[in-house]
């Protein structure tokens, strides 16, 4: 059996539970045709770069599949029929990645505290930083003439 990574985009107006139901439905199709589904990741609702079927956002989901080609073709056929699936892409891979995908790592990285989280809050008040001795005394400089505006 071949190894595949499969990503699909579901419509923005369905709930996260419905996305999970779609994943389970397609997992059932793969298993019914003699395959196995490994890692399943739900990347959540994300903005699209451009509109797809009048949608600006979509729910992203990733599945690692170990199945014969016929099982993948059947799953893709059902995705083409489904109104809830906007796009899908299946890629044959040599081996599945261990651990979370790059998208999940990025999401985890966003949750951690920032590097400067330890610093105290800066207070500039009215932004007065005091005299600037490198500029010299500006009191004796003549004022710039202003043009009369009409």
UniProtKB/Swiss-Prot annotation:
Gene Ontology terms describing biological process: translation
InterPro entries: Ribosomal_bS6, Ribosomal_bS6_sf, Ribosomal_S6_plastid/chlpt, Transl_elong_EF1B/ribsomal_bS6
CDD domains per record: bS6
MF term (GO), any: small ribosomal subunit rRNA binding
Keywords: Ribonucleoprotein, Ribosomal protein, RNA-binding, rRNA-binding
Ranges for region Disordered: 94-150
Highest taxon of the lineage: Bacteria
GO cellular component, one term: cytosolic small ribosomal subunit
Gene3D superfamilies, per the entry: 3.30.70.60
Family statement: Belongs to the bacterial ribosomal protein bS6 family.
Main function: Binds together with bS18 to 16S ribosomal RNA.
Protein name, UniProt field: Small ribosomal subunit protein bS6
Species the sequence originates in: Rhizobium rhizogenes (strain K84 / ATCC BAA-868)
Gene field: rpsF
